[in-house]
Amino acid sequence: MSANTQYIQQEVLKVLDQLSMPEKLSQQAMDESWQKLNQLQVLDQIDITSLDFKGTRSPLDESITIYNRGDMTADISGWHIQAGSPDQQYIFPEHTYLSPYEYIKIDTSGQSEHSFSSNQPVWNNRGDLGTLVNHHGQTVSSFVYGDKAHPHAIISHVNYDGKEFRSEGDEYVEIHNTSEYTVDLSQWRLEALRNDHCFVFPENTQLAPLTSLRVFTNKASLEDNEYSFNSPTALWNNDGGGCKLIDYQDREVSSYHY
């Protein structure tokens, strides 16, 4: 569980404890309790969903997108997006509201409603960290990619002794996010060391804070955070082997030997 989630759960329990007291609360106390719960809901349900750092038409054609996955309109006036450099910051103006299930895209340059208005790229193509911070200075969401993600993405386990006969399609490699950031794995790949099998993570593959994903040898019905090589034959030799995780710039991130 991430520190942010743990904080939110603890604060929600405090409010619920107050509301469950036998003594009748004043209207002011009730209003304050609801306000606190609303603030916690917003803190939990606003996310950075994507960061386009490559620039398709030009190096300035970058953007970062946030999303309200809750059913309450969020006032994000005074919140800011912090890029990797301290002077790269976008502050949301007064009267900025994020409706339920709405996206807001913040461009690097140009005259769109939300833009850094920068004449140079904001997001480093080799790797960077984007952070959404509320008006109290609390981190709401963080998104990391490239070399900035290297310390946080590890191959944590290889289940090389499958139970399925012959194909051993239930064997898998597990990748874990050790950080409080959302890690972008788009176009990263997982390579087997003893054969030429390779799995490439599709665009928009993300690993939430302190969670894991599994890449199976051959699994048809996939759940959240599950992927498959779709190999009809076994990949992982019971006598020994290994694999490595490579990022989108062909740099090794993690390896695992058994």
List the predicted regions and their residue ranges.
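Intrinsically disordered, low-complexity Pro/Gly/Ser/Thr-rich segments with frequent PxxP/GP/PP motifs
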Residues: 87-118, 196-229
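Charged, low-complexity interaction regions
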Residues: 20-27
